[in-house]
């Protein structure tokens, strides 16, 4: 059983062990879908739902599943929650579901979800397990949204375009255009732009971590001197 506190679980999911920036998992949907903010939010919310549900379920049955069928059982649980997320999107956000296409069912193959189920949920009680799933999901969603906003803004010159696909007619006029006349940059909308954007985000996180580490080192007090001195003795004693 893990001895992590709630604050450690939160920090790991959001920053220190972020599934996208540190573990670098789930790259296929992350790079393919994040051309706009609304696509990123749709996939991120579906992944968050699956992470929380699968972590909770795995934690509840952790004492009843033998080692030999552990992984197949986890995959079946994850697939069940992915099916639930897929049906919900078909019912309430069908147009967005059509845009995301195969990447919703492919959540089953996201190594981050199976990894959390095996490494954490199967060894911890339900409350820490669902908290871990929530924080990992929110951390993944935050990276998706940031990358989607970067690619949409640089690639198309807009933000929050097509939000009505997720939130209905009330969000139809939420689109932001910082520049009226903006030459579209197709490179950022295509997969190579996603690689560049993700690389910049990872570099930014590593730079922040290094800066904080240097600040902590500078703030540490210098070791206190004992006041004793060593005397070097040469020659022989007769």
From Swiss-Prot:
Source organism: Marinobacter nauticus (strain ATCC 700491 / DSM 11845 / VT8)
Entry EC number(s): 7.-.-.-
Region (Disordered), start-end ranges: 215-238
GO-annotated biological processes: electron transport chain
Signal peptide coordinates: none
Role played: Part of a membrane-bound complex that couples electron transfer with translocation of ions across the membrane.
InterPro entries tied to this protein: NqrDE/RnfAE, RnfE
Record-given protein name: Ion-translocating oxidoreductase complex subunit E
Family to which this protein belongs: Belongs to the NqrDE/RnfAE family.
Quaternary structure, from the entry: The complex is composed of six subunits: RnfA, RnfB, RnfC, RnfD, RnfE and RnfG.
Membrane-crossing segments per the record: 30-50, 72-92, 95-115, 127-147, 156-176, 184-204
Catalytic EC class: translocase
Predominant cellular place of this UniProt entry's protein: membrane
Subcellular location: Cell inner membrane
Membrane topology (UniProt): Multi-pass membrane protein
The encoding gene: rnfE
Keyword tags: Cell inner membrane, Cell membrane, Electron transport, Membrane, Translocase, Transmembrane, Transmembrane helix, Transport
Gene Ontology CC, one term: plasma membrane
């Amino acid at each position: 059983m893990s001895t992590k506190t709630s604050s450690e679980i939160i920090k790991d999911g959001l920053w220190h062990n972020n599934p996208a920036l540190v573990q670098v998992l789930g790259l296929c949907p992350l790079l393919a879908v994040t051309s706009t903010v609304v696509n990123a939010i749709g996939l991120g919310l579906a992944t968050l739902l699956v992470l929380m549900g699968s972590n909770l379920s795995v934690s509840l049955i952790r004492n009843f599943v033998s080692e030999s069928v552990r992984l197949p059982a986890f995959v079946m649980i994850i697939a069940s929650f992915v099916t639930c997320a897929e049906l919900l999107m078909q019912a309430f956000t069908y147009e967005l579901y059509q845009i995301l296409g195969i990447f919703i069912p492919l959540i089953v193959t996201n190594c981050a979800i199976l990894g959390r189920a095996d490494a954490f949920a199967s060894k911890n009680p339900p409350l820490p397990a669902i908290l871990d799933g929530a924080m990992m999901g929110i951390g993944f969603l935050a990276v998706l949204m940031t990358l989607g906003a970067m690619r949409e803004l640089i690639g198309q010159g807009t933000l929050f375009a097509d939000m009505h696909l997720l939130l209905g007619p009330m969000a139809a006029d939420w689109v932001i255009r910082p520049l009226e006349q903006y030459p579209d940059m197709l490179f950022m909308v295509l997969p190579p732009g996603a690689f560049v954007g993700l690389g910049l985000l990872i570099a930014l996180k590593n730079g922040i971590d290094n800066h904080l580490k240097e600040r902590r080192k500078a703030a540490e007090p210098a070791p206190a001197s004992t006041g004793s001195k060593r005397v070097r003795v040469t020659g022989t004693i007769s």
